[in-house]
Amino acid sequence: MAAITASMVAELRAKTDAPMMECKKALTEADGDLAKAEELLRVKLGNKASKAASRVTAEGVVASFVGGNAGALVELNCETDFVAKNDDFLAFSKTVAELVATQNPADVAALSALPLEGSTVDAVRLALIGKIGENVSIRRFVRFETANKIATYLHGARIGVIVEYTGAEEQVGKDVAMHIAAMKPVALSSADVPAELIDTERRVAEQKAAESGKPAEIVAKMVDGSVQKYLKEVSLLNQTFVKNDKQTIEQMLKAANATVQKFALFVVGEGIEKRQDDFAAEVAAQVAAAKQQ
């Protein structure tokens, strides 16, 4: 049997990015044949990726890229906040954001099929899963292409904003993007707030007003007032500017001779149900299963 040297392990690790112990095991199994060991590792990493691919990804990052007249915002998910800080994961997320901006894929499936590093985006993603041992997924993206200006803002890589705007001052775009990250509006103006959100708010207001015991006409006014207040709170233009509580965003934009055409806001894991492991329940289930054997 061929002797497995440290230099052989290092060479295999450099080629595959696999953990040192995995490289040594593969070389041992391949009797020192580097090419065969590399093939074995790729199979093992693929299997590892397959096992991880079914696990919930509620952590992750938001990445952005702006180049020329296009900009993109992407959300990539992983399983733990530890991996969300991994250099390889972060580098992959930035690459994906750039691909979205420059290649204009129609959806996540089209993005995954784009060429990358001599393979495809999805193949690189699977290799990353094999390397870090956690599921990694590209959840969503948005792309703006415009003759206007584009600003982006990332808050700790967990909140991301992209804004299309007009105006001479770039600081305006940065300020608006930062404000959106802080105040999380759901629409540009009151007229843009989705009808289902308004209906929900109206039902809640009606239930609260009905409990007041006041006359119907007063109740109706209370409901309308609550809905109008809600619309102001969740529409960007009506919100109070976080850097100047004497101005609304609309007033700030007017003073700067600027306008906002549209924006997108991503919050990592938004809407994903994160698995909460119950250790006691897991042990109880294992004990019960053992008794049935």
UniProtKB/Swiss-Prot annotation:
Primary location group: cytoplasm
InterPro entries the UniProt entry points to: EF-Ts_dimer_sf, Transl_elong_EFTs/EF1B, Transl_elong_EFTs/EF1B_dimer, Transl_elong_Ts_CS, UBA-like_sf
GO cellular component: cytoplasm
Signal peptide: none
Domain of life: Bacteria
Keyword terms, alphabetized: Cytoplasm, Elongation factor, Protein biosynthesis
Keyword Electron transport recorded: no
Entry's Gene Ontology molecular function annotations: translation elongation factor activity
Entry's localization field: Cytoplasm
Region of interest called Involved in Mg(2+) ion dislocation from EF-Tu, as start-end residue ranges on this chain: 80-83
Known role: Associates with the EF-Tu.GDP complex and induces the exchange of GDP to GTP. It remains bound to the aminoacyl-tRNA.EF-Tu.GTP complex up to the GTP hydrolysis stage on the ribosome.
Record family assignment: Belongs to the EF-Ts family.
Protein name as annotated: Elongation factor Ts
